[in-house]
């Protein structure tokens, strides 16, 4: 097992691929180490991140509030926050800052599948919010992984540069400079995220 310390919000990355943790083992590992946030990438490496600061928490709360409010009005999909984790087709277990899944896709899973700790479902839409210590290149790679695994729309919001990187299913990436609002396009028809509280 190799350890690679990194100077950002990722405290370290552990190559645990030889261990092949089951969902139950990974859940138990997360439960016993609640001061940290864990994900497993597509190569099987365990990514350990530190908690964000208050400003990041405030921004994340605002993003989740707006997404949930819209989702409840529209009733075609469900909004989730970062405590929810799912398993992508490449085996990565991810928990973006916010994500949204069409209701018919979510309820196509059995009750048992929905109650699994790391359900095997690809969100239709994800948001990652950059914190001050996040490495931008690593977040961009993560967004690429989402799209490669079937996410239809993704936003990487960078409040420090006041930029939004928009990732689409055709693998195109658009960067908006200091937008005040961003549209959910045809994936989240009618949804606009007001960024004035984020900047």
Residue ranges and their predicted role:
Residues 1-199:
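Gly/Pro/Ser/Thr-rich low-complexity, intrinsically disordered segments predominantly at protein N-termini
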